[in-house]
Amino acid sequence: MTKVLFVKANNRPAEQAVSVKLYEAFLASYKEAHPNDTVVELDLYKEELPYVGVDMINGTFKAGKGFDLTEEEAKAVAVADKYLNQFLEADKVVFGFPLWNLTIPAVLHTYIDYLNRAGKTFKYTPEGPVGLIGDKKIALLNARGGVYSEGPAAEVEMAVKYVASMMGFFGATNMETVVIEGHNQFPDKAEEIITAGLEEAAKVANKF
């Protein structure tokens, strides 16, 4: 049975957040099209995700080498392992997130930090790092009020670029991206822009 992990990184209600509308539309369409799949939702704002620090960094390194961990290191590693293992066990992973201040919410960055583990999501080789999750399907769902796909703002977009870059670093080669943008920049076209994006999300979800 296919396991699908939906990672939500926005705790605003759907009526206030286009990225949440996008996430919910994709989720509903996916469930309808894939009724036999096991779907797990991970709402990052409902989790306790401590920032990566000395205990987690030292602990994950020592654990990888088989060294003994301090009590605090063991606790930190257990937190990271919980989310890393869940990610690795999923056949497909869907990320729903907004662009805030040109990048992703801090909670999503912290979550991705947990996934970034040598020997698990990538490995070192003499030729450089090699990703290890190549067979995992990834979907990125993003909303941003301005236009960042082209024009002067394109070079400062660090939300989709960052998540896609990290998944690529982990070896993902099968990625779908649905972006709704410009609804704040062009308020007279906002309804049209959002509707088109939600329709696109439903189409992608059906085939994902």
Curated annotation (Swiss-Prot):
The UniProt entry, under InterPro entries, shows: Flavodoxin_fold, Flavoprotein-like_sf, FMN-dep_NADH:Q_OxRdtase_AzoR1, NADH:quinone_OxRdtase_FMN_depd
Q: How is the cofactor bound?
A: Binds 1 FMN per subunit.
Q: Which cofactor does it need?
A: FMN
GO MF: electron transfer activity; FMN binding; oxidoreductase activity, acting on NAD(P)H as acceptor; oxidoreductase activity, acting on NAD(P)H, quinone or similar compound as acceptor
Alphabetized UniProt keyword annotations:
Flavoprotein, FMN, NAD, Oxidoreductase
Q: Where are the transmembrane segments?
A: none
* The protein's enzyme class: oxidoreductase
Q: Which domain of life is it from?
A: Bacteria
Keyword set includes Flavoprotein: yes
Catalytic activity reads: 2 a quinone + NADH + H(+) = 2 a 1,4-benzosemiquinone + NAD(+); N,N-dimethyl-1,4-phenylenediamine + anthranilate + 2 NAD(+) = 2-(4-dimethylaminophenyl)diazenylbenzoate + 2 NADH + 2 H(+)
For this protein, the Enzyme Commission number is 1.6.5.-, 1.7.1.17
Which PANTHER family does the entry mention? FMN-DEPENDENT NADH-AZOREDUCTASE 1, FMN-DEPENDENT NADH:QUINONE OXIDOREDUCTASE
The entry sums up its family as follows: Belongs to the azoreductase type 1 family.
Q: How does it assemble?
A: Homodimer.
List, alphabetically, the NCBIfam families matched.
PRK13556.1 (NF010075)
Q: What does this protein do, in the record's words?
A: Quinone reductase that provides resistance to thiol-specific stress caused by electrophilic quinones.
Q: This protein is called what?
A: FMN-dependent NADH:quinone oxidoreductase 4
